[in-house]
């Protein structure tokens, strides 16, 4: 090595030799290279060889001067020294601590015995640093502090001042210098020598350069590392194959060949990974969102809820609630169940090991298998042997993430899929029918749009997701044994590159998919492959029914009478029975037509997106689909059951679903109503016959299932020992056998949750929630009926304006979702003036208006059943009569004859000739004062009259702003001197009922009240003084008018339009001038051509949506008379407005309103 160094130095000093000479020297160096005698590696330098030999010998010559740590490489010791704190590297300022530490510190270094490969010696080991040789080649380091003090005492005699080595300052005393250095500079001083520096990095460099030396261990002493003896090579054997390794990590890497590579598990959810950084990235999913601590949470961020309970984001630091099996991945509720499950794996492995050893013996292998099954209390499978790797019957159905709600909650971390805003994804039906995908960046569930699904469908087969690939039973990937980790996967990375970095891997075949949903769909291929290997179709269904032991899971069967997950998920029955899924073409039935009933193509996203079209009312269902049930002759029994449920929905169930989804009745659990309750439903007899046929087929299929299971149980009893009762994993027929009475009684004690839309039943409300959400597309976010809008900050649909904009035309919620009969038009169409009063030449309603009212939609007329009975006179009729006598002379006002009632407020009055003399009506019914001028000015008040001729004018044009007579008839008080009639006096307010019966009673009371008022007007005595013509006599009907005013206010009130509140007060106020006029002076019922008029109150609207929103106000039933003080206050505010009307010609001023006595 020395010669090579000398040659290298000569080459550096002198000129570069020629290439020939250089190549000759290089060849000489290669020939003289140093090789290892153990492994054969060659090195150009001896130092490199000596460092390499430490790997074989385990020598660690480099020792830490501050602890007992040793290292084989100098760089490793440098890294170790930096791990020490700075306080252990520098010398303490206290004299006792410093002296004790320096006195105890000994370095096993010799002056002449240094064995470093580089021949480097420490500078502090020489005599220059004050080291004195001791016995046994030991060196005792003197305290540098004592050394400095001795030098300082010698200098005090010669020099008067002491300089500072850092800032060149001088001090008279040594103590002052030390205080200055300690306070101003704070230097770092080496504990092993007198080296002092101001930088910590300089101190570390000094220790690495001067104090790190190598030492050869004495004899065959074992090197000690952190107090543990160094193990000799070849001391780590493999327990499986017996191969020995010198290092533990070599053995750990070797053990991956004998077991699964998922060695890194999550302690929260139990998921396992191959690499540690995968686990590290996975642990971020259990924490809060990235950046959520720094930014404030906006109102638009979705809130995670479970059953409408807000879930706060917390960092999960606890352990998992479930125990995970590391060999098969099943979940268990406690450790005892996991230990019992692991015993199965151990017995299976032990049986595999004993099988080759017992082959040479005379024992039959069948006896060994029989003994193993008897130990597990299992009956042998008669049809055929199951492969050793098969896990049939061992998977827990309740914890299957594909079929179970509980495992689905674990997989989604308790966050239920809920759209952030309903309007963001279009209509509600489209949102329910869309596909749900989990966005890993936003960590929320999103709805896949229709355009994206269309692009996926239109994409070529090469770019299609793996779930679209057709798989046939002859596929080599599916035909053989399902190895969890197959060796050949050529297209795995290619498909992963197209997945945009977000993939889900199938644990059975190793394929990678872009989304977890695609992987779930792909798993059906493996389920069909397992079913193809099984001769009977019942094996696949029983594989998910339960675990090996009853203690594997605390969850019990989720459906009454069935422990199978198929009963809770009807879509799984199609996957188990039908081979024509999304990845294969459905085979035609025996009749030549495809089996559309059982193919899973009906639940594809395209069919779900158009699912709302299948729930419409009317005759859009073709008769051939109703009369011809598409049931194949070769269809299995389970498919017949599914077919019967599907075909029944095409019959009467189809119409009932549509009614229940939009506006269900108050008895949702009732049976299917008769066809007489339907609206134009065709082919009722064919539907009935179809239903009977399907019921018989369903009963026949159930008998087949029960017979098949009894036969299977009988075979199991014959094969097992007579004193042992075999464990039935399916538990499907436990109710039919005598041995299952105990289980039947336990299951009967549980609460059964039936579906209100079909015959589905389950023990778990969560499963019922998912069933209604998926199959019936019902929003189950609340317990309210589906026609009520969801509450909360997201429920934009609960607003009245949203209801108007969405175009909802069904019956109001107050009627319980039932259609009510339209009001009869005959009680409004009068053709003669009652009582033969003068002025009967007033025209009746035009024919066009009647035709328009008759042709109005039913849903508009159905809202007219309002609380008409409230307008009947109360028990204060006599008090009103006494308060109305002699308060105003008859000559102060002019009374017009009574006009005929009109059907709508938009009808115009025909011109009638005026009368020069005063003409009074024989009937004392009150009339509104008519104010008519010869030529009305622009700023004059609009005129409203009942239809009689005016006084002082030769001709009065018809007034188009007149209010409807039906409203006036309801607002008219009782005549003077007329006692309360039997039909209207003291009519009580009926209680609020949500049924149709309450609405019919309200309409009957309203009809009676209207008829009694007409009779009262006809039977009034002709000699009664017309004292009701003045304005001061109208407040006499105090109780009656207050009722009418309160009702009319809220009947015409729209929450988004506060102007309607003032219009309601203006119309219903007791003042005569404000009967048809609002506070702003504009008439309330200005009906122009093309307006939409309310048939109840006569108010006109410009848009049909406004009329629909207004008609909902008529369905409100008030149970009290309302506040009386507010009415008096409002009436008093109208008084100044009445006083300003004295300037209008031909009018009579009305005094301020006041409360009657």
Swiss-Prot record:
GO terms for molecular function: cis-regulatory region sequence-specific DNA binding; DNA-binding transcription factor binding; zinc ion binding. Residues 1-26, 449-503, 523-653, 831-996, 1013-1040, 1123-1157 are annotated as: Disordered. The lineage of its organism: Eukaryota, Metazoa, Chordata, Craniata, Vertebrata. This is Zinc finger protein 516. Residues 575-585 have a biased composition (Acidic residues). Residues 1-420 are annotated as: Mediates promoter DNA-binding and activation of transcription. Belongs to the krueppel C2H2-type zinc-finger protein family. It comes from Mus musculus. Pfam families: zf-C2H2 (PF00096). It is found in: Nucleus. One of its GO terms (biological process) is positive regulation of DNA-templated transcription. Transcriptional regulator that binds to the promoter and activates the transcription of genes promoting brown adipose tissue (BAT) differentiation. Among brown adipose tissue-specific genes, binds the proximal region of the promoter of the UCP1 gene to activate its transcription and thereby regulate thermogenesis. May also play a role in the cellular response to replication stress. Its main location: nucleus.
């Amino acid at each position: 090595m020395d010669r090579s160094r000398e040659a290298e130095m000569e080459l550096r000093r002198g000129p570069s030799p020629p290439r020939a000479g250089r190549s000759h020297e290089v060849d000489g160096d290669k020939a003289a290279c140093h090789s290892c005698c153990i492994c054969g590696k060659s090195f150009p330098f001896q130092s490199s060889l000596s460092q390499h030999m430490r790997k074989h010998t385990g020598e660690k010559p480099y020792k830490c001067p501050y602890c007992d740590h040793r290292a084989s490489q100098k760089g490793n010791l440098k890294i170790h020294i930096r791990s020490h704190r700075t306080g252990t590297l520098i010398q303490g300022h206290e004299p006792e601590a410093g002296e004790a530490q320096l006195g105890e510190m000994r370095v096993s270094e010799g002056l002449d015995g240094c064995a470093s490969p580089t021949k480097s010696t420490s500078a502090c080991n020489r005599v220059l640093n004050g080291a004195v040789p001791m016995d046994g080649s030991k060196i005792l380091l003197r305290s540098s502090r004592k050394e400095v003090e001795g030098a300082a005492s010698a200098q005090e005699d010669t020099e008067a001042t002491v300089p500072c080595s850092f800032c060149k300052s001088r001090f008279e005393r040594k103590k002052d210098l030390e205080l200055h250095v300690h306070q101003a500079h704070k230097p770092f001083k080496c504990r092993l020598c007198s080296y002092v520096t101001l930088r910590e990095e300089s101190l570390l460099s000094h220790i690495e350069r001067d104090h790190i030396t190598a030492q050869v261990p004495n004899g065959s002493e074992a090197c000690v590392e952190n107090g543990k003896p160094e193990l000799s090579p070849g001391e780590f054997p493999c327990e499986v194959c017996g191969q020995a390794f010198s290092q533990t990590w070599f053995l750990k890497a070797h053990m991956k060949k004998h077991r699964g590579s998922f060695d890194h598990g999550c302690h929260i959810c139990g998921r396992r990974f191959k690499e540690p950084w995968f686990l590290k990235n996975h642990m971020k999913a259990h924490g809060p969102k990235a950046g959520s601590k720094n930014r404030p949470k906006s109102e638009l961020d979705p809130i995670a809820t479970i059953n409408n309970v807000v879930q706060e984001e917390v960092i999960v630091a606890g352990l998992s609630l479930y125990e995970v099996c590391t060999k098969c991945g099943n979940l268990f509720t406690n450790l005892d169940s996991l230990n019992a499950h692991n015993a199965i794996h151990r017995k299976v492995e032990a049986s595999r090991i004993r099988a080759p050893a017992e082959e040479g013996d005379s024992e039959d292998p069948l006896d060994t298998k029989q003994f193993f099954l008897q130990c597990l209390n299992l009956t042998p499978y008669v049809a055929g042997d199951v492969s050793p790797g098969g896990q049939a019957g061992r998977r827990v159905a309740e914890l299957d993430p594909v079929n179970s709600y509980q495992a689905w909650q674990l997989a989604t971390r308790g966050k239920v899929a809920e759209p952030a805003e309903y309007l963001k994804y279009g209509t509600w039906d489209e949102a329910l029918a869309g596909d749900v995908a989990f966005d890993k960046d936003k960590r929320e569930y999103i709805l896949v749009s229709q355009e994206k699904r269309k692009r996926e469908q239109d994409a070529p087969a090469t770019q299609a997701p793996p779930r679209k690939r057709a798989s046939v039973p002859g596929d080599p990937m599916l035909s053989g044994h399902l190895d969890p980790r197959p060796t050949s996967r050529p297209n795995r990375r290619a498909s992963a590159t197209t997945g945009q970095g977000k993939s889900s891997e199938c644990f059975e075949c190793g394929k990678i998919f872009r989304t977890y949903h695609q992987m779930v769909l792909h798993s059906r291929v493996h389920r069909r492959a397992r079913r193809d290997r099984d001769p009977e179709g019942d094996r696949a269904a029983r594989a998910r029914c339960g675990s090996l032991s009853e203690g594997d899971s605390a969850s019990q069967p989720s459906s009454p009478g069935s422990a199978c997950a198929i009963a809770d998920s009807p879509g799984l029955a199609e996957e188990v029975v039908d081979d024509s899924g999304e990845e294969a073409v459905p085979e035609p039935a025996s009749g030549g037509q495809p089996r559309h009933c059982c193919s899973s193509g009906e639940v594809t996203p395209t069919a779900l997106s158009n699912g709302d079209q299948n729930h419409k009312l009317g005759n859009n269902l073709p008769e051939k689909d109703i009369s011809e049930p598409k049931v194949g002759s070769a269809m299995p029994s389970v498919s017949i059951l599914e077919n019967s449920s599907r075909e029944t929905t095409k019959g009467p169930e189809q119409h009932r679903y549509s009614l229940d989804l939009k506006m269900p009745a108050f008895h949702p659990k009732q049976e299917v109503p008769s066809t007489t309750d339907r609206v134009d439903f065709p082919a009722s007899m064919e539907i009935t016959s179809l239903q009977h046929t399907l019921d018989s087929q369903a009963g026949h299929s159930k008998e087949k299932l029960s017979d098949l299971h009894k036969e299977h149980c009988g075979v199991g009893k014959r094969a097992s020992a007579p004193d042992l009762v075999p464990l039935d994993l399916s538990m499907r027929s436990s109710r039919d056998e005598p041995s299952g009475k105990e289980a039947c009684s336990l299951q009967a004690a549980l609460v059964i949750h039936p579906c209100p839309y079909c015959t589905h039943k389950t023990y778990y409300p969560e499963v019922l929630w998912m069933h209604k959400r998926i199959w019936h597309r019902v929003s189950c976010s609340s317990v309210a009926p589906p026609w009520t809008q969801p509450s909360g900050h997201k429920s934009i649909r609960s607003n009245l304006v949203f209801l108007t904009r969405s175009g909802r035309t069904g019956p109001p919620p107050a009627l319980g979702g039932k259609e009510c009969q339209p009001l009869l038009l005959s009680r409004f169409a009068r053709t003669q003036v009652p009582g033969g009063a003068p002025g009967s030449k007033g025209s009746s309603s035009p024919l066009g208006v009647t035709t328009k009212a008759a042709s109005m939609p039913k849903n508009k007329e159905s809202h007219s059943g309002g609380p008409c009975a409230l307008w009947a006179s109360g028990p204060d009729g006599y008090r009103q009569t006494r308060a109305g006598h002699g308060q105003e002379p008859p000559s102060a006002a002019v009374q017009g004859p009574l006009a005929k009632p009109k059907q709508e407020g938009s009808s115009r009055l025909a011109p009638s000739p005026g009368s020069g003399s005063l003409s009074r009506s024989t009937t004392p019914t009150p009339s509104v004062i008519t104010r008519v001028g010869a030529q009305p000015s622009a700023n004059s008040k609009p005129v409203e009259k009942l239809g009689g001729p005016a006084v002082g004018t030769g001709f009065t044009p018809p007034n188009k702003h007149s209010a409807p007579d039906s409203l006036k008839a309801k607002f008219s008080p009782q005549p003077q001197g007329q006692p309360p009639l039997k039909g209207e006096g003291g009519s009580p307010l009926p209680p609020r009922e949500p049924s149709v019966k309450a609405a019919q009673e309200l309409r009957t009371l309203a009809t009676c009240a209207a008829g009694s008022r007409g009779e009262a007007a006809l039977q009034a005595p002709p000699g009664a003084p017309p004292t009701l013509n003045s304005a001061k006599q109208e407040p006499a009907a105090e109780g009656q008018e207050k009722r009418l005013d309160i009702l009319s206010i809220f009947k015409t009130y729209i929450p988004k339009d506060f102007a309607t509140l003032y219009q309601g007060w203006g119309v219903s106020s007791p003042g005569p001038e404000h009967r048809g006029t609002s506070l702003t002076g504009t008439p309330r019922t200005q009906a122009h051509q093309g307006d939409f008029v309310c048939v109840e109150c006569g108010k006109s609207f410009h848009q049909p949506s406004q009329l629909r929103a207004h008609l909902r106000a008529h369905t409100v039933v008030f149970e009290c008379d309302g506040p009386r003080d507010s009415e008096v206050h409002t009436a008093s505010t109208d008084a100044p407005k009445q006083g300003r009307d004295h300037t209008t010609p031909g009018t009579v001023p009305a005094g301020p309103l006041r409360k009657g006595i």
